[in-house]
Amino acid sequence: MDFKQIKSNVEKVKFLRKDFPILNKKFDNKYIIYFDNAATSQKPKNVIYSNVEYYENYNANVHRSGHKFAIQSSIKIEKTRELVKNFINAESAKNIIFTSGTTDGINTIASSFFYSKYFKKKDEIILTTLEHNSNLLPWVNLANLANLKIKLAKFNEMGIITPEEIEKLITEKTKLISISGINNTLGTINDLESIGKIAKKYNICLFVDAAQMAPHIKIDVKKIGCDFLVFSGHKMLAPTGIGILYISNNMAEKLHSSKLGGNTVEEIFIENEKIKFKASDSPNKFESGTPNIAGIIGLEEAIKYIDNISMDFILEHDKQLIEYGVKKLQELDEVEFILNTNLKRNSIISFTVKNIHSHDIETYLDTMGIATRAGRTCSYVAFFPENLNKDHLLRISFYFYNTQEEIDNFILGLKKVIKELS
């Protein structure tokens, strides 16, 4: 049976779940309820088998040797690059850089800014109070090294960074805005297209952390108008250790790579008794050494899988799960939502339970085969007293293979935890 021939969304999800081995195995006599998809997604068979096929049948390094295995591997790499280009509607495959993940992509550009001497002293970078540490610390480090100023845009009562909040922070010294499309703590969605127009208006670089966005919402870098965009494969069905960095043509020409080695130069020569080199064009100049070939091949299969079921289906299913999950949690008097219940969420619900620490809930739920996330979700600034004013929370995050039945079982488990630990 073909997925597209199935009419009912419930039946579609049942059909898709068969593709995920980990969802069809019992652990301690229980099937896992996996509600930690914001951390990483599970992997379908086609992704898993693509890696086995590569290592068994054409394992070789890429863009170097001329034998058939190397040629086949290189073709697969460039095929995936083209697929990613279409996935985010980039201008060219040359704008697509393979990284080890979102964090690596952000650090790559932060260090490239430094090596390229892009900023002047006292220039400003705008971040937000809802950023993951990975979209905070590289910029803080850059600011410390280059004597820059960091400004933080605050979220409103709906957990959103408004374009107006961004614009009021802009001065003639503002050179970069870095913001997440969907934040990993609340799951709220920022208006990137409006923020992109503001960045263009003031001739400011726009950097987008799309780690939570890429698995759930169609990305169009042309509509956003961003100069950079990063995401990780492992949150959208692909293996760990593979990510994407999109760089606009303009910025690819301006920046020097901070990571040099094989594949990054066209020529090395001696001039005035000094060794010099001519850097390769993008993407090569940003991809030093041997890439994660198996990861890239797995990413190709992951994108094919998502394209087949469509982002429209994923978005609609996310919406149904969020609405149902919020409704069921509202029935529990002990549950306190972060900010409020009416947030425009994508795939994440965060809350606390009165008088019970979230880590205790997480641990107890794990004994029932329910995977969640507790703590500060690697977004420490968000938890400051002037922001969320929380020490911890419990986060549940969905993907298209999750079901309302799983939410029902989660609620039963949570009720048991509350009864036992209150």
From Swiss-Prot:
Its UniProt entry gives the catalysed reaction(s) as:
(sulfur carrier)-H + L-cysteine = (sulfur carrier)-SH + L-alanine
A Gene Ontology biological process annotation? cysteine metabolic process
A Pfam family: Aminotran_5
Q: What class of enzyme is it?
A: transferase
For this protein, the Enzyme Commission number is 2.8.1.7
Which pairs of Cys residues are joined through disulfide bonds in the record?
A: none
Q: Which family does it belong to?
A: Belongs to the class-V pyridoxal-phosphate-dependent aminotransferase family. Csd subfamily.
Query: Function, please?
Result: Catalyzes the removal of elemental sulfur and selenium atoms from L-cysteine, L-cystine, L-selenocysteine, and L-selenocystine to produce L-alanine.
Name of this chain's protein: Probable cysteine desulfurase
- Look up and give the organism this protein is from: Borreliella burgdorferi (strain ATCC 35210 / DSM 4680 / CIP 102532 / B31)
- Whichever gene encodes this chain, its name is csd
